[in-house]
Amino acid sequence: MRNTARWAATLGLTATAVCGPLAGASLASPATAPASLYAPSALVLTVGHGESAATAAPLRAVTLTCAPTASGTHPAAAAACAELRAAHGDPSALAAEDSVMCTREYAPVVVTVDGVWQGRRLSYERTFANECVKNAGSASVFTF
């Protein structure tokens, strides 16, 4: 009987020692700082000749990071980020420039965008009739 009382006391003290700090930690967790102050926006953009990204070899690829500041290997990162912000991160919503005149030559160019925009996964592919149409379709995002 005395051994049972000792075991019960030992288990009670062990449970208090192990679980006591955990209870205090759960009370303190709402006061801790958030892991990140902004949602990540980091993209990889590619361009290649062909009708589909599956069959076209990428000719060029750039990185574009838009949060917290515009950076990456994209030659006009700040302008490209501003255009994507205006389109709410949707590359298909980028406004085409009406003032650009392009030939009707068919030399397909495919662009892809893969990555994360404001914490959401993004995957986009579009085929343009030629390089001129691609550059007119987005002032900065696909001009690299």
Swiss-Prot record:
It is found in: Secreted. Belongs to the protease inhibitor I16 (SSI) family. Strong inhibitory activity toward subtilisin BPN' and, to a lesser extent, toward trypsin. The keyword Membrane does not apply. One of its GO terms (cellular component) is extracellular region. Residues 1-35 form the signal peptide. The gene is sti1. GO terms for molecular function: serine-type endopeptidase inhibitor activity. Homodimer. Disulfide bonds join C66-C81, C102-C132. The record marks R104, E105 as: Reactive bond. It holds the Pfam family SSI. InterPro entries: Prot_inh_I16_SSI, Prot_inh_SSI_I16_CS, Subtilisin_inhibitor, Subtilisin_inhibitor-like_sf. This is Protease inhibitor. Keywords: Disulfide bond, Protease inhibitor, Secreted, Serine protease inhibitor, Signal.
